[in-house]
Each structure stands twice: as structure tokens, then as C-alpha cells.
Amino acid sequence: MKVKELTVEYGNRTIIENLSMQAEFGEIIGFVAPNGTGKTTFFNAISGLIPKKNGNISLNKIDYNSRGATYLKELFFLESSKNLYDYLTPKEHLEYIKAAWKSNSDIEHIFEQLKMKEYQNRTIKKLSLGMKQHVLLAMYLASDATILLLDEPFNG
């Protein structure tokens, strides 16, 4: 992932100004800062959920300006348990992700790897917070995305 001189504004307020960074495959980067300083805004801008004012973003040499399926398939953005639907099962969540990302992942293998087979058919509403976090990780694995963005992964 490569970000060069990223600027993001809300109205007349600049939230991110001229941010540049680069992350190589396999590298883990953390942003530690007080609430309200732009961490979520950064993830939203990279994901194309909000517009950027200036700057260049590329994921695995795929340009942000395309923001098509190829760009978005490289990225998986998790915001705590906001990505989960209470009345679906973990298995249904993974099947949806696999279809949306056109992934070749083996859902049964993912459940085995994460020791989730016993609760793959329970509704999300009936799962503990720890189990829900396992479901989020499983969703990422099912996507085949190469970049994982975690917003407040230890929240809750």
C-alpha cells in the first residue's frame, strides 16, 4: 500500500493533511492516537467510503482512482462488530464474503483452522464478543484480500 500526500476534509475542516506512508506485503502498521484525530477517516478514505481532497493511493499497484472491483478486492476493512448481522450465522457471513470477493477460499477449512466449526451455524446474536471477533477474522480469510484494515480491533 502506498499513500502520498493524502489530504481529507470534512466541509472546511482539514482532518488529514499531506499524509504519506508505505506498507510492504506482510508488514504490520499501527496508528496510535487519541480519539478524533483521523484514524477512522484515514481508513474510510483508503476504502473509498469518503472522498479525498488530494493525494495518491495505490494498493498493490492498483490506483485508487479506479476504485473498481480490482481495487476493492485487495482491501478488507473491519470496524469492530459493525460488519456483522445479528440474525445471520458465521457460515452465512463467510458465504457472502466469498461471493462478494469472488474468492476461492475453503470456508470449511477456515472454520477448522480457527476452531469455529461448533458455532458456525449459530446466529451472531448468540455469540460472545470473542466468538464475534473470530467471525471477523474468518471473514477476512474468506475474502482473499491482501490488505486488512482494523479499526479499533480491541474495542469492547
Question: Which stretches of residues belong to each language-model region?
Answer:
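Catalytic Walker B motif of ABC-type/P-loop ATPase nucleotide-binding domains
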Residues: 148-152
